[in-house]
Amino acid sequence: MKASNKLSISSNYLPAGDQPNAIKKLCEGLKSKKFNQVLLGVTGSGKTFTMAKTIEELQRPALILAPNKTLAAQLYGEMKTLFPNNAVEYFVSYYDYYQPEAYVARSNTFIEKDASINEQIDRMRHSTTRSLFERKDVIIVASVSCIYGIGPVENYSKMILDISNKDNIDRIDLIKTLVSLRYKRNDHNFNRGNFRVLGDVIEVFPSHLEDRAWRIDLFGEEVDSITEFDPLTGHKLNNLENIKVYANSHYITNKPTLDQAIIKIKNDLEIRIKEFKLEGKLIEAQRIEERTNFDIEMMEISGTCSGIENYSRYLTGRLPGKAPPTLFEYLPNETILFVDESHVTIPQINGMYKGDFSRKSNLSEFGFRLPSCKDNRPLKFEEWDKMRPETVFVSATPSDWEMNQTYGEFVEQIIRPTGLVDPICRVKPATNQIDDIIGECKETIKKGFRCLITVLTKKMAEDLTEYMNDLGLKVQYMHSDIDTLERIEIIQDLRKGNYDILIGINLLREGLDIPECALVAICDADKEGFLRSHRSLIQTIGRAARNVNGKVILYADKMTNSIKTALKETERRRKKQIIWNKEHNIEPKSIIKNINNIIELDVKKDSNEEDSILKDSKHNINKYMKELKKEMLEAASELKFERAAEIRDEIKKIENKELGI
């Protein structure tokens, strides 16, 4: 039976502005089984708080879908703060680095799969699925990568080791079961996903826990006691009556299923070899035979192989072309789906399958993989649309697709509780725009505020950064070549004042919380296209809407339809907010937000020394982490548990900072 903790917000704030009405309408819609709703909420109107209050009001689990890891981390931090006593989980891609296997036919180049898995995110993914099995008060924040396949819920749910006090269990059987759940025996280096055996005592480090492990004491063939302990110091934490050990992999498969899968793989391999030989493709026939037989041999010996996900169709028993199992199959029926920044997230979901299919087709065509590899894929948009639960699309600029789902209806959240008004927008000639921008930036910086400049190309971003640097301005650029973690650090540095100006292309739009920003300059605003559509312009204008002194300058030599639409909508919102402020006697105030909230959760920097350590080690953070872990284990082996615990806490801080949560 699932735990039924009440979903309860811990906050001194009450809904204000348009929030009470938005919460009421969303709840009424969901109670009346309205499948699609749109929350049109402007920047700074408290859309996250509205989502949270809706979840609390309805007491239903929720999945919040974000377009990227940066925004997912930000949302996770906010939800974790709002719901401290509930299961707020984080489900994003666990790859720090991922190079998928691929074949480039024109140069006859095969690129092997290369990946680096982030252990912390892997733990959080396991924590997510465990919470879905055991609790009702679950809020999951996920990136769009959650539409990629994981192991089927029916297999995962069967592979759970349930142990209670006084249970009869054979020691050897217990060890075999742990191995079948993909736990590794390691009596010396005890980490997450391992177990160790000390006589009649078996210690397990569960896949979902970070700093706690379980000790099972056997007396003969009876469970004498179960305790929770600190794996680093060995200190006992709690006595437990019952534990459930979940598999150490979402791709877990029991032996009978694996045996059946291998038979099917062998049959399909024979068919594929014949096909290649009939087409005169002898190299491809030999290649597919060698590679697949090697994988089969590994599966027979160890129960898995490198790239086992390419055989997911056989392991799940699904027919060719059927939707892969994803996180959506783990969700309870009453789950609410919130699609944040839906105007960006929906197109991403729509495009993920096509890119993946092209690469897999090449691998299959040239004998590197069986055709079944094409079924290891993200959901097609139509599949996702069919299986998603009741949905609220959240955006300041919802696209036509979302509006069509609701037949043009939407819940509007224009009024900001802070009284902040949409920024004043001015249009200036694009001629000599750089000189004018520099002058505007200098004026803004004098007042202690930050500036955002959006341009059209990476080269322009880099060149303008170099030019402004030469003029003595503290400036940095940010575009898609900058990795996620570095982007988070750049934003934090901007807020701290290490930079005064940030130049970007398409990343200075959705969801960036920079209350210190008082100037947004849009270069070449009259160049019609995706980057200068009315939706893009409205989103970019919104970056200055968190500061009472915010202003936006659009540099254009002609008034395009997009500019006219964006300015008209911004002015409509300004007027509505001004009227509300007068009626309620509200003086607008800039949003005040703790700088650390953008990049970390529950992480307090104890000293400047730690920051300098991180900065010095940034170029080789993995090496530094290994050194710390080695030092921690050495301290523990020397029984210096207090020192070991201090190092462990430092490792946690760095991991959280690296994750951006």
Where are the regions a protein language model picked out?
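Conserved RecA-like helicase motor-core motifs
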Residues: V38, P84-Y94, G307, R450-L452, ...
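Conserved Walker A/P-loop ATP-binding site and its immediately adjacent core
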Residues: Q59-T81, A87-D96, L456-K459
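Conserved helicase ATPase core of P-loop NTP-dependent helicases/translocases
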Residues: I482-I505
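Walker A/P-loop
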Residues: S32-T54
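N-terminal cationic and glycine-rich segments that engage phosphates or anionic surfaces
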Residues: V38, F91-K446, K458, T465, ...
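Short amphipathic alpha-helical segment within the helicase RecA-like ATPase core
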Residues: A73-T81, E101-Y103, D463-Y467
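Conserved pre-motif I regulatory segment
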Residues: M1-L40
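Pre-Walker A (Motif I) flank of P-loop NTPase domains
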Residues: S32-V38, R60-P61, D137, F449-R450
